[in-house]
Amino acid sequence: MKKLLFTTALLTGAIAFSTFSHAGEIADRVEKTKTLLVGTEGTYAPFTFHDKSGKLTGFDVEVIRKVAEKLGLKVEFKETQWDAMYAGLNAKRFDVIANQTNPSPERLKKYSFTTPYNYSGGVIVTKSSDNSIKSFEDLKGRKSAQSATSNWGKDAKAAGAQILVVDGLAQSLELIKQGRAEATINDKLAVLDYFKQHPNSGLKIAYDRGDKTPTAFAFLQGEDALITKFNQVLEALRQDGTLKQISIEWFGYDITQ
């Protein structure tokens, strides 16, 4: 009964960000300031980017805004290049990363994550005229434009590709257009959004891995109480259809399951 009443409270209104027992340092600061500091790129559409009016928006941005709203917190975004994102978290420049980041085994050794709030997969992008790359194996010895610390970059390196380090997806795709890179591995949803915005890009998805990689919010280890709060709200947003609604607004279908 207590669990039911708590879930109902989550579904119908905001939850007070109450005092935690055994709270971490970040949770203590958030409780005092009532402000959540969020690390995000702001350049990775459709997850985190600026619209035509200059407003920071995107799927990940709107999900964490809704979570913060339910917790009775204000949100302050700290825009950061991807390759500096986890360094920023380590330095406590922000409390959490909201940037389509997945809890890989390597990251789980150093960081803690919420339950997933969406699922996507990896694809290889090449020029439309290039039919020589049809799998990860075909990347061996080829030039692949990747963020140095991303999982996609590690996948490309594992496949034997020559890595051209870039800041993000947009730069990767530009290098392919220019002929300076032959391919890139990235998130399928981000690539499809780019194609939607640039229908004459001259690029294509050369290979779709067909996987469903989970995405979650990343925290420093030791913030279990704060993560528990996040997980409770995410579950409530899943139950009342809010997560699905946000997903449909951005993608036309549900990516949260």
From Swiss-Prot:
Gene Ontology biological process terms from the UniProt entry: amino acid transport
GO CC annotation: periplasmic space
Keyword Transport tagged: yes
Keyword terms: Amino-acid transport, Periplasm, Signal, Transport
SMART domains: PBPb
Cellular localization per UniProt: Periplasm
Range of residues in the leader sequence: 1-23
Entry-linked InterPro entries: SBP_3_CS (IPR018313), Solute-binding_3/MltF_N (IPR001638)
Residues forming coiled coils: none
PANTHER family: L-CYSTINE-BINDING PROTEIN TCYJ, MEMBRANE-BOUND LYTIC MUREIN TRANSGLYCOSYLASE F
Family note: Belongs to the bacterial solute-binding protein 3 family.
Known function: Probably part of a binding-protein-dependent transport system for an amino acid.
Protein name (database record): Probable amino-acid ABC transporter-binding protein HI_1080
Organism for this UniProt entry: Haemophilus influenzae (strain ATCC 51907 / DSM 11121 / KW20 / Rd)
High-level lineage: Bacteria, Pseudomonadati, Pseudomonadota, Gammaproteobacteria, Pasteurellales
